[in-house]
Regions:
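Short Cys/His-rich micro-motifs in 6-15 aa windows
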Residues: 30-37, 94-101
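Short cysteine-rich clusters marking metal-coordination/redox-active sites
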Residues: 8-11, 26-29, 72-75, 90-93
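Canonical alpha-helical transmembrane segments of integral membrane proteins
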Residues: 335-351
């Protein structure tokens, strides 16, 4: 039988169990720890795995009788629509080489979110996008014509699961005081533990290899309470993509967002420290369920200098995202201008208050720099560029339920620094 050796989080010396107190003791530094904290510290970091229950219902013979499949020879898209709808071009690449095919298997969607945004509204959203964007490249300043506009149902997998998180942090509190000609700094070291659980419903991951995850995640959220049961008639006049990325492959992305949400939620419960770092973590998920759905998207492309740019619009809410780049030259000029203006105003105020010391000017410069960066990032945000989501917090049903909240002081160390006299500073 293997022997497990536990080490002190403070000094790394061996720990022994004290039957009287029920705690783990360190003979080297006299620290005491609860058993569950030491067990958590020694737990391996491991990514949570979920056994999601994937759907198995395929299109029925009745569905197939009322539906038409198409195959794009250009990009390989596998598409379906209602039987009376005739497709003349691929909604992804615009190719006219789209051939009729037969419905041959495929997971049947359980729900469909209908289109609310009309073609005219989507076109207005595209045209309005270019107004007031300070960091748009000059090529978008005029003649923004729609090259192609397509109405498409995109296949998604919706993931439900429960998550458990247990994280140990190293935390510090820093205190500085003056004792005569000495500056004394004391750093207190703590071990902090947080454990909790979260439940998630309907985390969407698109099941189309042809749709960039950054675009589909930027279109969130959809109001799934407005979804209707799938029937072939729902596809009348609209193409729908076959899910060519299965639920097992999409599971990883859902779990990544769940883990990130769990980590962020537990970290947000740690307060009152000057610095906090993760010492160890254990995140797991369970009870997974998967639901296949179709969600509405308008795809619009425009061509500039022989390059195609894509705009995607949430067909339910009208939310827009795109792959338009930032004009870096304009971003620099706006940042420099904002810095100069803010710093100049701060310098004027300090001059009027007769506070033009080197320390105050340095602080004014730092504040001006941060303010200028805020201006630039605000302007970049106006471009609505597609970006991946980093969490699934919006799909949590109750937020984080905290089960363990543990803060224990470990030790403190003190440093002393001699302060140069004001006379010496003035002479220098």
């Amino acid at each position: 039988m293997a022997t497990v050796a536990y080490k002190c989080p403070n000094c790394a010396s061996p720990l022994t169990y004290d039957g009287t107190t029920g705690k783990m003791l360190c003979a080297a530094c006299d620290s005491q720890f609860d058993q569950d904290t030491i067990e958590a510290l020694n737990a391996q970091e491991e990514a949570g795995t979920v056994d999601f229950v994937a759907p198995t219902e395929e299109y029925s013979a009745s569905d197939a009788a009322h539906m038409q499949a198409y195959h794009c020879k250009s990009c390989g898209a596998e598409l379906i629509t209602e039987g009376t709808t005739t497709a003349t071009e691929c909604p992804y690449c615009g190719s006219p080489t789209i051939l009729p095919d037969r419905i041959d298997g495929g997971i049947r969607p359980e729900m469909v979110v209908p289109f609310v945004i009309t073609k005219e509204q989507a076109q207005q959203a595209f045209e309005g996008y270019f107004k007031g964007k300070k960091l748009l490249p000059n090529i978008f300043k005029k003649d923004n014509q729609i090259a192609e506009m397509r109405k498409l149902f995109v296949p998604y997998w919706l993931f439900d699961c429960n998550a458990e998180g247990d994280i140990i942090y190293n935390a510090e509190k820093k205190h500085t005081r003056r004792e005569g000609e000495w500056e004394v700094t004391t750093v207190e070291h703590y071990i902090v533990r947080r454990a909790g659980s979260m439940s998630f419903e309907n985390i969407p991951v698109d099941g189309s290899v042809k749709m960039d995850d950054k675009i589909t995640e930027s279109l969130e959220p959809y109001d799934l309470t407005k979804a209707v049961p799938f029937q072939p008639t729902v596809l009348s006049g609209v193409m729908a993509d076959h899910a060519d990325v299965d639920a097992d492959d999409c599971e990883k992305r859902a779990v990544e967002r769940v883990e990130s949400s769990m980590i962020n939620s537990l970290r947000n419960t740690v307060h009152g420290y000057d610095s906090v770092s993760v010492r160890s973590k254990n995140i797991s998920a369970s009870g997974g369920k998967v639901t296949p759905v179709l969600l509405p998207v308008w795809l619009i492309t425009t061509r500039k200098d022989d390059k195609v740019y894509t705009f995607a619009i949430n067909g339910q809410t009208g939310k827009l995202t795109c792959d338009v780049p930032t004009d870096k030259g304009k971003a620099f000029l706006w940042g420099a201008g904002a810095f100069a203006g803010i710093f100049g105003l701060a310098a004027l105020v300090l001059y009027l208050l007769k506070m033009l010391a080197s320390g105050t000017m340095l602080m004014a410069g730092i504040v001006s720099l941060f303010a200028a960066l805020i201006v630039v990032f605000t302007l970049i945000g106006q471009l609505k560029q597609a970006a991946s989501k980093t969490s699934a917090a919006g799909y949590s049903t109750e937020g984080c339920q905290l089960h363990v909240q543990y803060d224990r002081f470990l030790y403190a160390n003190t440093t002393r620094r001699k302060i140069e006299s004001q006379n010496k500073e003035a002479a220098a």
